[in-house]
Amino acid sequence: MANIKSAKKRAITSEKNRQHNASRRSMMRTYFKKVIVAIEAGDKEAAQQAFSVATPILDRYATKGLIHKNKAARHKSRIAAKIKAL
């Protein structure tokens, strides 16, 4: 554990941020799992609807730095291709 007061505060802040980011990352994954489930079921309409809900969330977290913008683009591209192939 840190001995300097500012380092102690920083450790507390870092832990809060880690938990907050973990929650957001989990939510993001959940939305994309819904899209994947719809694709695997072969339901194009449900997959498109779930994808339209998940896309802005992915973009938002890419903008905020939770994930890299290229990773967001890669996920969107791959999912869109899978939906198109249905």
Swiss-Prot record:
One Gene Ontology MF term: structural constituent of ribosome
An example Gene Ontology biological process: translation
Compositional bias of kind Basic residues: 1-11
InterPro entries reported in the protein's UniProt record: Ribosomal_bS20 (IPR002583), Ribosomal_bS20_sf (IPR036510)
Domain of life: Bacteria
Pfam family, one: Ribosomal_S20p
One GO cellular component term: small ribosomal subunit
Keywords: Ribonucleoprotein, Ribosomal protein, RNA-binding, rRNA-binding
Region called Disordered, residue ranges: 1-26
PANTHER family: 30S RIBOSOMAL PROTEIN S20 (PTHR33398), SMALL RIBOSOMAL SUBUNIT PROTEIN BS20C (PTHR33398:SF1)
Family: Belongs to the bacterial ribosomal protein bS20 family.
Function: Binds directly to 16S ribosomal RNA.
Protein's UniProt name: Small ribosomal subunit protein bS20
Source organism of the structure: Pseudoalteromonas translucida (strain TAC 125)
Gene behind this protein: rpsT
